Amino acid sequence: MPPHPPFCVLMAGLPGSGKTTLSRALTARGFIRLCPDEEMFRRHGVYGVDFPRGVFPTLERPVLEDVAADLREQLKAGHDVVVDHGFWTPEDRAKWRAIATDAGATPVLVYLAASHDELWARISKRNEFHANDPNSIYFSESDLQRYRTRFIPPQPDEPHLLYEGDSAAVIATLESFSA
């Protein structure tokens, strides 16, 4: 068991903002990584190919419930966990912070801010891998623009770390919390 209550790292970010990159850096430091997109791919296949795009929220709901149950178990077992998911709204983030707190963990929200051009460059590059990579769900630029209108970045009253592409800085901050 870690010398501190386990961390639960939650991320707020749009597709292409670096969530998977950061979560993989945390797994290299011993974090358990939970990824709803990978579970969606495992259960249902390729987004927009094996199931219609419009049913994603309906199919995702039970996946998120199962990921939340797994999160509770991992945190109660004393493991540090990172949830590789976008958490687009304050309400969604509050719900998952409560799951972490109820399991005895310290929730840490990381905001992955990025410009439209940066997001679109990353998404368009990884779109070619969407058929075989659960972390490369195909999105058009108009999808990204629509998603941006639904994404609510953390505000000053919602404690968070700002990720600017430096995983080591996030790791150092987490280590300072447990010192």
How would you describe each model-predicted region?
Residues 131-179:
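Small-molecule kinase domains that catalyze NTP-dependent phosphoryl transfer to phosphate-bearing small molecules
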Residues 17-79:
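Conserved substrate/cofactor phosphate-moiety recognition/catalytic segment
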Residues 31-33, 107-109, 158-162:
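Conserved beta-strand scaffold positions in the cores of enzyme catalytic domains, especially
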Residues 58-107:
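Glycine-rich phosphate-binding loop used to anchor ATP phosphates in small-molecule kinases
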Residues 1-5, 74:
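Phosphate-binding P-loop
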Residues 11:
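Hydrophobic anchor at the beta1->P-loop junction of P-loop NTPases
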Residues 101-152:
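A glycine- and Lys/Arg-enriched "phosphate-lid" helix/loop adjacent to the NTP-binding pocket
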Residues 38-40, 113-119, 167-168:
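Conserved nucleotide-binding/hydrolysis micro-motifs of P-loop NTPases
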